[in-house]
Amino acid sequence: MLHSKRREYTANNQDVTYTELKTCKSPWKHRIPTVKQSPVVLCEEQLKYGELTFHRTPQPQPRKQAMGRKRQGPKSTVWRVVTGMLGALCVVLMTTTGILLPKLFSSQEEQCRKTSLHPLRCPKDDASCDLCSSDWIAFGNNFYCVFKENTKTWAESQSACEELNSHLVIIDSKAEVENLLLFEMDGWILHKMDGTNSSWLWRNDIKIQNTLTNDSEKKNHSCHYLRGNLFMPDECSAKKSYICEFNI
C-alpha cells in the first residue's frame, strides 16, 4: 500500500514541498520473464523523495506610491516642527505685546505731561527780560516761578511779582493745582478774603468754601498761601515764599 506525507519549508521567499513515497514488502516475488532484463525484487522498504518547488509571486506595488510615502514622511515631520515653533512664537509675541503696551502708553502720557511743563531759560545776554534771572516752569501759556530765598509779606510778594511784569499765582483749575503740586511749589497765592460777604474769593471771583468761622480770624487771616495740596489762611503780614505767574 502506498502512503504519502508532505512537509513544507519556506526559505528565501520559496515554498519547498517534500513528498515521501513508501513501498512495503510484498510476499510475492515479481520476476520479469524476459531474459535480457535482470529480475527486480522489491524486498526491502524503499524511500523516494521528490522535490517540488513553488515560487511565490510578490504583489507588485506602485513604485511612485512607495517613493511618495518615503518622501512624505520627512516633509510632514518638518512641517509639524515648523508649525509648533510658529505657534510658540505667536504666544510669546502676544504675551510681550500685552505687557509692553500699557507701559508704553503710561510713559507717553508722562512724557507729554513733562513736555507741557518744562523749565524756561532765557539767553544770558538778554538784560531786558527780568524773567530770565531764574528758571520759570511753563504750563500752556502760563509760566511759574517760586521765590523761596527772599521771604516777603503778601503785599510785598505781590509788588515783587509786578516788578517782573507778573503777579501772584492765580489758580483757575484743578489741573493747575496738580501741576503746582508736581513741582512742589509752596508760597503766597493771589487769594484773599472779601470783607463784604465773608467768603473766600479768587481773583477771578471763583468762590471756595469758607474755612474760618470767627470774624477776628477772618480779618487777621485774610491772605492765603499754598502748602502741598492745602490752601492755608494766614496773616498777610507774615513773611513767606511766594509764587509768581506770568501769562503770555
Swiss-Prot record:
The chain crosses the membrane at residues 81-101. Residues 102-248 are extracellular. One of its GO terms (molecular function) is carbohydrate binding. The keyword Repeat does not apply. Residues 1-80 are cytoplasmic. Its main location: membrane. Residues 139-245 form the C-type lectin domain. GO terms for cellular component: plasma membrane. Keywords: Cell membrane, Disulfide bond, Glycoprotein, Lectin, Membrane, Signal-anchor, Transmembrane, Transmembrane helix. SUPFAM superfamilies: C-type lectin-like (SSF56436). PROSITE patterns: C_TYPE_LECTIN_2. Glycans are attached at residues 197, 214, 220. Signal peptide: none annotated. A motif (ITIM motif 1) lies at residues 16-21. InterPro entries: C-type_lectin-like, C-type_lectin-like/link_sf, CTDL_fold, NKG2/CD94_NK_receptors, NKR-like_CTLD. It is a single-pass type II membrane protein. Disulfide bonds join 132-145, 161-244, 223-236. Lectin-like receptor for natural killer (NK) cells. Heterodimer formation with KLRE1 mediates inhibition of NK cell cytolytic activity. Contains 2 copies of a cytoplasmic motif that is referred to as the immunoreceptor tyrosine-based inhibitor motif (ITIM). The phosphorylated ITIM motif can bind the SH2 domain of several SH2-containing phosphatases leading to down-regulation of cell activation. This is Killer cell lectin-like receptor subfamily I member 1. The gene is Klri1.
